[in-house]
Every structure is written in structure tokens, then in C-alpha cells.
């Protein structure tokens, strides 16, 4: 056991000392997998296997780097020496929130790791299932994956005391690994407080501009001093809980309908899209104080577009509606996210609607013909034709595999 512990300590030290090179290698391997489909038989399976393996290794490296870099103490002298010469970045709000729940709830940590493990390997599992099983059994495997993911997401909601799921649920590698590869022998760039164990950057290692930026980094906002649970609001009513439940169950509903009706039938696509919009509408209405509804809220503040229309003497209800829709200001203060963590999650869920361009009738009748037409027109051009040939190889993959177009 002691020898195994020493081996892990040695690997962690190696990871810290070569973090930049390891990150570059991971990025290169991922890039290679994008060009593999269509190059040889089962190339997409080989490429996805490499991609999944690199993704899992990256998840492990992220956890190691986060645990070592942001811990107040370290058990290994070599690791401490590496960190003594590094410029430790500030902990992000997302990392504060997710690391807090990992620390206070083991169940959250297990569920979050299991969810990210499944998401890293789900496409590979689907490829294997479609090669080994018949069509209906392969769809059963996909349904099983989505049911397990839904269960894990409900577990995250429960362990965070009725808060929405934040993606990704674990801290990420949010700093440049090259920052960990400074030479401490040349100039000590940080010092560690003996009483608190906190790492601070040395003033002697800073230029004038660096010192100014370092002082700015210590400027605290309301979100910086808030307790991690306050970065995401808990559900205030049953409508909010139902909205999150609908959002979590949305992929399960879609996959079950795909198994019954097929990908070309409009019913799975329409149902999934309506459920997505229903979840968003319920969430918005749940945030509005009781006695009001989102449809009865006062209009948002006048935008610059509305002002220009008034100056030009143009009165048009459609243009006024369009200007109001383009406004990024919320129609009620409660609709504004309480932190960047909550706001980024809302934005990510809004962007997920773009994936419907790769699904169902929209994919087969509009998006796919457009891409195929582009590939045909550019196949004899040198640079554009190269990228067109890559896109051509992905068309049958999106037709066959669900997880190529899944959120």
C-alpha cells in the first residue's frame, strides 16, 4: 500500500511538472479522432474509443490538478516545490459551487462522477450496442443509459437541497497548465502562509503591470463573498421542481419515442421540442412572484432600437415586439440569474435548442440536404473540399447514432 501511495505521489508530481505537455497531447489526440471517420473500416469506433479514453484521462487529471493546486496543504515535498514557483489562478464561481457540494456530500460526488463517466462513454457504448445487438435491443441500451442519467441528475437535485443541475457537475481545468511550470529556483513566484496555508504570489516576481492585475484579482464582488450554495437558487415552489423534472426527463421521452416511431417520424421531434419549451416556460413562471405571470409582466426597459423607431416616427407593433425580444434585460428582477453559475447554466440550456437542427425531420429535410449540397459544390476545391469531405463522413453517423446529436 505504501509503495502504491508513493507511485501515485510520483505521478501527481510528474503531472504538475508536465501539465502543459500532457494537455497538448490530450488536445492532439482529440483532434486526430475528428478526422478518423471514413478512413478505414470501423474507423469511427476506433476514433470514439480513443476519444473516450482521452476524455476519461482528462477528467482524472482535472480532479488531480484541482485537488492539489487548490488544497491548503500538500503531503509531498516535490509537489510543494512545484506549487511554490507557480502562479495559482483564482478559483472560479463554478469551481467553488461544485467543489462545495462534493465536499459536503459524498453522494453528490459519486453521482457527479458517474454522470460524467457515462457522458464520456455513451457514444462508444451506443456504437458497440448497434454492432452487437439488433435495432430494438440497441435502442433499449440507449434508453437504459438515459434512464440512469436521469436518475443521477435527480440525485444531484436532491443532494443540493432542491437546486437545478449544473453542468458540468464537477470542477474543470480552468487555468493554463503552463502556469504550473515556472522554475522556482530562478525566482520564487509565490509564498505559502504558515498559519493559513494559503498560497500568495510574491511581489518580487511581479512587473508593474502584473502587480496592478494582481491587486485587481483580489477585488471581491458580491458573488465572491457569497456562500457557495447561494450561487444557485433553490426551488421556491412545486412549479420550479416540476420544470426541472420535465427538463431531466426530456431525453428519456425523446429516446422512447424514437424507438417506437423512428427518427424520420415528426412525432418524437415535435414532442421533444414542445417538452423543452414547456420546461423553459415553467421555469420562467416559477421565478415570477405569486400573483403575476410572465405574460402579464411589464414590458422591458426601452431599448436603443425602440428609441430609434420613436425618433424616426415609426410606429409598428411587430417592430416593437422584435425590439423587446432582442432586449437582454429581464422583464422582472427575479428573472435575472443570481450568479454567473446560474446564468451560464441557463444560457447553455438555451443553446441546446440548436441541436434540433440535427434531429428528426429538420435534419433529414433541411440541414442534411444543405450540408450535402455544400459538400458537392466544394469537393473539387483544395482546402474547403478537405473540410467538406470530413463533413460528408459525419452525415451517415448522425443518421445512425443518437448521441452524435444529443445534448
Where are these regions (language model features)?
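N-terminal signal-anchor/initial transmembrane insertion module
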Residues: 1-106, 110, 117, 384-407
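Helix-turn/linker elements and helix-coil junctions of extended alpha-helical scaffolds
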Residues: 60-68, 132, 159, 260, ...
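Hydrophobic, structured segments
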Residues: 157-358
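Membrane-lumen (extracellular) interface motif
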Residues: 35-46, 125-141, 256-271, 288-294, ...
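C-terminal transmembrane module of eukaryotic multi-pass membrane proteins
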Residues: 316-407
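Transmembrane alpha-helices of multi-pass eukaryotic membrane proteins
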Residues: 19-23, 41-54, 111-112, 136-149, ...
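Fungal eukaryote-biased detector of long internal structured cores
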Residues: 50-53, 57-230
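Membrane-embedded alpha-helical transmembrane segments of multi-pass integral membrane proteins
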Residues: 26-29, 33, 54-64, 115-125, ...
